[in-house]
Curated annotation (Swiss-Prot):
It comes from the Eukaryota. This is COP9 signalosome complex subunit 4. GO terms for cellular component: COP9 signalosome; cytoplasm. One of its GO terms (biological process) is red, far-red light phototransduction. The keyword tRNA-binding does not apply. It comes from Brassica oleracea. Component of the COP9 signalosome complex (CSN), a complex involved in various cellular and developmental processes such as photomorphogenesis and auxin and jasmonate responses. The CSN complex is an essential regulator of the ubiquitin (Ubl) conjugation pathway by mediating the deneddylation of the cullin subunits of SCF-type E3 ligase complexes, leading to decrease the Ubl ligase activity of SCF. It is involved in repression of photomorphogenesis in darkness by regulating the activity of COP1-containing Ubl ligase complexes. Its main location: cytoplasm. The keyword Cytoplasm applies. Belongs to the CSN4 family. Keywords: Cytoplasm, Developmental protein, Nucleus, Phytochrome signaling pathway, Signalosome. Component of the CSN complex, probably composed of CSN1, CSN2, CSN3, CSN4, CSN5 (CSN5A or CSN5B), CSN6 (CSN6A or CSN6B), CSN7 and CSN8. It is found in: Cytoplasm; Nucleus.
Length: 45
């Protein structure tokens, strides 16, 4: 489970960086990433 979490977080940070390249609304991307991050954390409990 821990490895999955690390991989997922790495994927989200990479996709976030990619999205920032062509998405002007950075706050929306950040909010989405935080929601996904929180979902992962609660799912791992």
């Amino acid at each position: 489970k821990r490895k999955f979490l690390d991989a997922a977080l790495r994927y989200y940070s990479i996709s976030q960086i990619e999205k920032k390249a062509y998405l002007p609304d950075k706050s929306t991307v950040l909010d989405r990433a935080m929601i996904e991050h929180n979902n992962l954390l609660s799912a791992s409990k």
